Amino acid sequence: MAASTKYPLVNKIRQSPPVDLSIPYDSAWLKGKTILITGGASGFGAGFVRKWAANGATVVIGDVNVQKGDSLVRDVQKETGNNSVHFVHCDVTDWQSQVNLFKEAVRLSPHGGIDTVVANAGIAGEDPLQRPGKLDAAEPPKPDFRIIDVNLNGVLYTSHLAFFYLPRNPGSTDCNTSSDPNANPRDRHLLLLGSIASLAPIPIQPQYGAAKHAVLGLFRSLRSSSFMQGVRINLLCPYFIDTPIVTTGARIALAGGALGKVEDVVDAATRFTADSRILGRSLVIGPKLNVRQEENGEWTLVAKDPPESQETAIWEAYAEDWEDSEAFCRSLVRVLNAFQKTRGWVGWAKDIIGAVGYGLGFIRR
């Protein structure tokens, strides 16, 4: 039987090659960048702030916790000598609150724009979805879907605003795999925070699992078209990391296993943020393991320090989405490329949208 023909689209969507973690990046590439982080007052966000401020970035933190945010800014300014670290109160579930955060970040930016947006805000906690209350009640009370509001709707607001502000970043150009991160700090980068719950089921937390699956879906969709705005997008999917979001119950459930380290998440995020050549890639961060790659590409857990083994906490996920494609995706990407080149296809696009809408049942006479 003849081998099937593949239709790779990685070049068409401007996706960079798989991340080679053996190649070092330079944290000094962060100097002069302006970075906006939602949920930046604790956990991963605080780790990002400390690392990036120490390397000369202007960092604007948006968080609902004023006390933690103000305290973090004071500490980081004192530790690093970088006074370009700012806190802005922001409720990511409130549209206008996020708009105000972005506007303030632009105002505080030394060059009047934003280079990287990090959609980091997220919460976990008791999930009432499967607990409707007393079954003999006349009617069920309205459930609290705050986890969805923060972890999904908040991320959608952040992403939408990123696509408004990043292309307006003065001095920035369209994302490019051959850009020189050492020559120009200007960037257009959206970094999404998923989770291991983006990739695997998580019991007792249906809202959290649904939201993080949605963030993965958002990333996989956006990376196929964000080049139209010249924006590069990347995704982090941390395993259970030693932060306050991992509850006591979760720690008990993980007893005997291992938690990942914040510094590994910060390292992966810093690679993405510093290196403007990385486009459309996702990394999973877990506990450090000793592994060896087999001939078929699969990884095998091995004892420490055997021949050809390596210690790593970072893995690439969904690396092959666009190594092959089916007809609809090929056609769509061709359309997007044509749009970027000509900007003159409005009437034709209406026909295409109408045809797709008809096929999906939205438009029927």
Predicted regions mapped to residue ranges:
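Canonical Rossmann dinucleotide-binding motif of NAD(H)/NADP(H)-dependent dehydrogenases/reductases
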Residues: 23-60
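C-terminal helical subdomain
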Residues: 12-15, 20, 235, 252-347, ...
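Active-site helix of classical SDR
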Residues: 159, 211-212
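Residue(s) in the substrate-gating loop at a strand-loop-helix junction
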Residues: 195
